[in-house]
Amino acid sequence: MSMFCYQCQEAAGGRGCTVKGVCGKTEDIAKTQDLIIYVVKGIAIYSSQAREMGLNTSEADKFIVESLFSTITNANFDAKALNARVQKGLKIRQSLKDAIIKAGGSYNSKENKSWTSKFLSVLGIKNDKDEKEIHDAAVWAANNPEDFKKKAETVGVLATENEDIRSLRELLTYGLKGMAAYLEHANNLGYDEDSIHAFMEKALVATLDDTLSADELTALVLECGKYGVDVMALLDKANTSTYGNPEITKVNIGVRNNPGILISGHDLKDMEELLKQTEGTGVDVYTHSEMLPANYYPAFKKYKHFVGNYGNAWWKQNEEFEAFNGPILMTTNCIVTPKASYKDRMYTTGVTGFEGVKHINTSKDGKKDFSEIIEHAKRCTSPKEIEKGEIIGGFAHNQVLALAPQVVDAVKTGAIKRFFVMAGCDGRMKSRNYYTDFAKALPKDTVILTAGCAKYKYNKLDLGDINGIPRVLDAGQCNDSYSLAVIALKLKEVFELEDINELPISYNIAWYEQKAVIVLLALLHLGVKNIHLGPTLPAFLSPNVAKILVENFGIGTISSVDEDIKMFMN
């Protein structure tokens, strides 16, 4: 069976990638990632039961989060690292199984189905009835890449034959991948929430359950949105408690004459470590793409060698990384297949990886040693200037709520007629120029609320302000879509409205990968309706599942700029 992947917006032909991923991943990488998900589901079978028995599941919890994150679009292309993850997962699954058997395999639960009997079956004492109750994901075993490869042939997306069940299972899985990304960042800062892990494991197990109906899976998808809100709130708390609340900031987009390191991705802990270790070395630090919002946090402003932001959204990195001249640190997705001209200057860390690119590991005490990349930078010339000037951002919920009197007054007087939430992702497709044209064509009495790399389609346009309020308010990274939800809920309260959809807010969101999926599900959980997704609807939505979203939540797509603005403003 050839590869099949349709988890991102650029799925080939709007259906799925079957030969090679548009993202650049090969068939082998795609299938190994499928196998990682299968292993994670097997672990979840045991960890969810171990949790109910009061056993320690921290190792499994961490592994599940990291593994889901590692399979997100443009995160990891390193076959060796991915195969090692499969191997490690099987060991963790076995240790959980052993712990449950040792504990007696019995616990108080209405769903208790004689775990002692099940594990006797696992150990070779077969009972036909019990044998059927254990899913293959919990029992299959292998110990080398060749056997992994054979197994991967059988466990991909298309292993679920029913189109609608497959669609719901994948929608749920992609929501979990986005959730895992946010939970990983919170965990790195010392913040966690057991209920989120418990839900993730419950949901993973549910994707293996052939007895669940489409309605039951739909309910789980919507429940996923609830935990999406929880995980974004947790990450917001982690970021702001550690680094302070983002504040209005003018960010330099030019360069200096010192050698520099370019840091891309989302992990603020990595940002902090890099700034600390480069201080006093003569090496400057620049953010790239989704790391831009690091410029808004008070804790990072004390570093005089933190220059600003270099470049644009992730998909332009081939030309921008080449021009930067210094080393690049990828803390998370999005990685584009590197050109030979800079591949030896590229470093990955965390769950990211690319074959032939140096990887910086985390030590046992949770620290990272960036000395190699710092010494590398010292041997490089300073970055080539590709633009200059400033952009403004830092409008997360705390900052916007501080401006609430101005904003409310502007709405009441009619100076602001409507807000447009244009959060989400950027991408390569030319059809995404729609978002630049849309921003330019919006009436002058409207304000754009944004988060994520979608902002790069319009954050350098001169769209002016309304009574001193910039017409583009950037809350931060994609997870800071949480801020936009907090702002909307506060405005609902201020204007004494019963329904969030009564606010003068329209949602025109550009999506690309799985973090956008969890943001969408979170918004649906909060009751937001009539969200428009573009530039295309997800390939993983079957016609029937798409119909559910349209009929129950008013999900729509985009058409032309003029038609859409007319529709939104009426």
UniProtKB/Swiss-Prot annotation:
Bound cofactor: record note: Binds 1 [4Fe-4S] cluster.
Gene Ontology terms describing biological process: response to hydrogen peroxide
Subcellular localization, as worded in the UniProt entry: Cytoplasm
Keyword Membrane among record annotations: no
Gene3D superfamilies the record matches: 1.20.1270.20, 3.40.50.2030
Residues the record lists as Cysteine persulfide modifications: 425
Enzyme class: oxidoreductase
Amino acids binding [4Fe-4S] cluster: 5, 8, 17, 23
Similarity section: Belongs to the HCP family.
Name this polypeptide is given: Hydroxylamine reductase
Organism this protein belongs to: Clostridium botulinum (strain Kyoto / Type A2)
